[in-house]
Amino acid sequence: MDGSGEQPRGGGPTSSEQIMKTGALLLQGFIQDRAGRMGGEAPELALDPVPQDASTKKLSECLKRIGDELDSNMELQRMIAAVDTDSPREVFFRVAADMFSDGNFNWGRVVALFYFASKLVLKALCTKVPELIRTIMGWTLDFLRERLLGWIQDQGGWDGLLSYFGTPTWQTVTIFVAGVLTASLTIWKKMG
């Protein structure tokens, strides 16, 4: 490290500020993409377009492909549809905390967190609670900052996501992410 917060050997930016900035861009883009695929216009999500470098574009594409695969998992969709959003903050933080409760951090779980946040945002759009959208995005980024930032830094920044998902097949990744989220939702329902 040269003190700049970036790894000199191409591992990607690992400063806290850069990880949070990239995380916010990825989350916003992921949620906008999910809303667009649902046919929903989401003016609440429209922000000024931010120029993305090649690495961020690759990360966005990776997240989109995983999201597409997760959308086709009917068991996961059924469980998410059954989530009661009367107290969305409690639901979000309980499910998010449960995903990482065993202390094992990995990119599959980070993607599952983004996917769950996008589903809560889409529920807010469908139920006409647009003020909840920015709030959910804020919760996700707060959780990322408080619980995941150090781990993402240790992985060399967001570029570690591409390395992680570059090795297994998409089907394996999708099954893993869906499993983590399904297990978290099941535990939450039993506790709730």
Swiss-Prot record:
Effect of K190R: Partial loss of polyubiquitination
Transmembrane spans: 172-192
Residues modified to N-acetylmethionine: M1
Domain description: Intact BH3 motif is required by BIK, BID, BAK, BAD and BAX for their pro-apoptotic activity and for their interaction with anti-apoptotic members of the Bcl-2 family.
PTM (free text): Ubiquitinated in the absence of XRCC6/Ku70. Ubiquitination promotes protein degradation. Ubiquitinated on Lys-128 and Lys-190. 'Lys-63'-linked polyubiquitin chains on Lys-128 are removed by USP12.
PROSITE patterns: BCL2_FAMILY, BH1, BH2, BH3
Function description: Plays a role in the mitochondrial apoptotic process. Under normal conditions, BAX is largely cytosolic via constant retrotranslocation from mitochondria to the cytosol mediated by BCL2L1/Bcl-xL, which avoids accumulation of toxic BAX levels at the mitochondrial outer membrane (MOM). Under stress conditions, undergoes a conformation change that causes translocation to the mitochondrion membrane, leading to the release of cytochrome c that then triggers apoptosis. Promotes activation of CASP3, and thereby apoptosis.
UniProt entry keywords in alphabetical sequence: Acetylation, Apoptosis, Cytoplasm, Host-virus interaction, Isopeptide bond, Membrane, Mitochondrion, Mitochondrion outer membrane, Nucleus, Transmembrane, Transmembrane helix, Tumor suppressor, Ubl conjugation
Tissue note: Expressed in a wide variety of tissues. Isoform Psi is found in glial tumors. Isoform Alpha is expressed in spleen, breast, ovary, testis, colon and brain, and at low levels in skin and lung. Isoform Sigma is expressed in spleen, breast, ovary, testis, lung, colon, brain and at low levels in skin.
Record annotation: effect of changing G108V: In a Burkitt lymphoma; loss of homodimerization
Subunit structure: Homodimer. Forms higher oligomers under stress conditions. Forms heterooligomers with BAK. Interacts with BCL2L11. Interaction with BCL2L11 promotes BAX oligomerization and association with mitochondrial membranes, with subsequent release of cytochrome c. Forms heterodimers with BCL2, BCL2L1 isoform Bcl-X(L), BCL2L2, MCL1 and A1. Interacts with SH3GLB1. Interacts with humanin; forms fibers with humanin which results in BAX conformational changes and sequestering of BAX into the fibers, preventing BAX activation. Interacts with SFN and YWHAZ; the interaction occurs in the cytoplasm.
Cross-link Glycyl lysine isopeptide (Lys-Gly) (interchain with G-Cter in ubiquitin), sequence positions: K128, K190
Molecular function via GO: BH3 domain binding; channel activity; Hsp70 protein binding; identical protein binding; lipid binding; protein heterodimerization activity; protein homodimerization activity
PANTHER family tied to this protein: APOPTOSIS REGULATOR BAX (PTHR11256:SF42), BCL-2 RELATED (PTHR11256)
Gene3D superfamilies: Blc2-like
Protein name, as recorded: Apoptosis regulator BAX
Motif BH3 in this chain: 59-73
Residue numbers covered by motif BH2: 150-165
Native source species: Homo sapiens
